[in-house]
Structure formats: structure tokens, C-alpha cells
């Protein structure tokens, strides 16, 4: 007897693929100005980062991804092509909790940082912890932009991976790739760094309405030096 696909748990309609937001989180973002420290020079910061990231976040990521998302990762071998080189990773934004976790498992054992909305460092308690987990909030003014870009350069030069969600807004369980601006690709162009695509897909499970995630890695992709800088970003995006 042929089984039918389960009905959708929720149907959502959109009008603007770039700006519609379906996350339920309501957070008042703090202002990220020139006083924000993207790189903390204090000697205890690295130790705190190790404890928060390796001893807390990674086990939490493993448990959540395996038990809640039933996650599987494909094509991780492509990471070998870049060795110890720092890279950018571009992903589709479809999980409010899973998206901070999935890249850390997919890219393990690399040290991962993420370019995030200021909301992610504005939460009363967790917002104090997220910088130790790798959050790099977008600056709120031009003066803060220099520190932001310097931090990105530093992390790439030390061999870390920086995750970018260019779609910006969360569309839970969305199965397509949304339109996003080519300016999102300016980081690998300016730093002449390789980049990867991280695509999370959703697959039906036999005895559950909640799907399994399968995340694919593709790349590395490099800026085309035969093109002018703006065209390089467009070519990487396409």
C-alpha cells in the first residue's frame, strides 16, 4: 500500500524573499559601536573560549543535532582541499537553534566563528556567552566597521572558518535557496580566501512528521582574479 506524504505542520506565505522574517524571537538589539571589542586582548579570553566552545557548545551541538534534527553530513572530505587555511562558509538560514550548531559539527575540528545580527549578543544572559562561542555581530556604524573587518581578517589568518548566512532572515524548514545580495561575498573577495557552500536539506522520516536534516558541503570556491572586485563577488554568489 502506497503511503502518502504527511500534511505540512504549518504553511507560511511570503511576499519578500529578502526581508520577510519568520523567526519567533523578539529581541531588542544592542548598538554595536566602536567601543565593542571583537578581539578581546585579555589573557583569560582564550581559556574562556575553549571552555565555552569546546567543552560546552560542541557537546550541546552534537546532542541537539543528533537527537532533535537527526542530522547527517555529506561530502565533508572537500574540507581537506584547504588544509589549515582559513575559509568562509555560506549556508541557507532555516533553523533558529540548529543553524548555530550544524556548522560546528559539519566543520569539526575547525574553530568556527559566525557573522551574526546584533540580536545574538543582546540577550540578557546568553548574549554574554555568544562572543565566546564565536559570534561576530554586524557593526551599527562606520566607526565600528574597521574593528569588525580586522577581526574577520585575524580569524581567517589564524585558520578559523567564518560562517555567513547571507539570506539574513530565518525561514524555518524552507527547502529552496533564497535570493541574497552579492555584497555578502565581499569577505572572501577582499581577503582572497576560499569559501564553501553549506546547504541544509530536509528529508521525510518514516515514523515522524518532523524531517531529518542532511547537510551538504561543496567547494572550495575561489575569487576569479580575471574579474574586477565587484564582478568577483557576483561570480562567487552565482
What positions do the PLM features span?
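Membrane-anchoring hydrophobic helices of lipid-metabolizing enzymes
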Residues: 1-88, 98-102, 127, 132
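Soluble catalytic domains of membrane acyltransferases
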Residues: 70-234
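Short, cationic low-complexity segments
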Residues: 237-238
Amino acid at each position: 500500500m502506497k503511503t502518502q506524504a504527511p500534511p505540512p505542520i504549518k504553511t507560511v506565505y511570503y511576499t519578500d524573499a529578502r526581508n520577510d522574517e519568520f523567526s519567533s524571537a523578539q529581541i531588542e538589539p544592542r548598538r554595536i559601536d566602536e567601543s565593542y571589542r571583537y578581539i578581546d586582548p585579555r589573557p583569560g579570553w582564550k581559556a574562556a573560549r575553549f571552555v565555552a566552545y569546546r567543552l560546552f557548545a560542541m557537546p550541546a551541538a552534537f546532542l541537539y543535532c543528533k537527537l532533535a534534527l537527526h542530522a547527517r553530513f555529506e561530502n565533508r572530505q572537500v574540507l581537506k582541499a584547504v588544509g589549515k587555511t582559513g575559509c568562509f562558509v555560506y549556508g541557507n538560514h532555516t533553523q533558529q537553534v540548529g543553524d548555530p550548531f550544524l556548522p560546528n559539527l559539519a566543520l569539526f575540528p575547525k574553530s568556527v566563528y559566525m557573522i551574526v545580527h546584533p540580536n545574538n549578543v543582546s540577550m540578557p544572559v546568553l548574549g554574554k556567552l555568544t562572543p565566546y562561542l564565536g559570534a561576530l555581530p554586524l557593526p551599527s556604524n562606520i566607526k565600528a566597521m574597521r574593528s569588525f573587518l580586522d577581526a574577520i581578517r585575524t580569524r581567517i589568518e589564524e585558520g578559523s572558518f567564518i560562517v555567513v548566512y547571507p539570506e539574513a532572515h530565518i525561514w524555518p524548514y524552507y527547502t529552496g535557496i533564497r535570493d541574497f545580495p552579492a555584497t555578502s561575498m565581499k569577505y572572501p573577495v577582499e581577503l582572497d580566501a576560499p569559501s564553501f557552500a553549506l546547504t541544509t536539506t530536509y528529508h521525510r522520516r518514516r515514523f515522524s512528521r518532523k524531517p531529518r536534516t542532511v547537510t551538504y558541503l561543496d567547494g572550495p570556491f575561489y575569487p576569479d582574479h580575471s574579474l574586477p572586485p565587484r564582478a568577483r563577488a557576483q561570480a562567487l554568489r552565482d
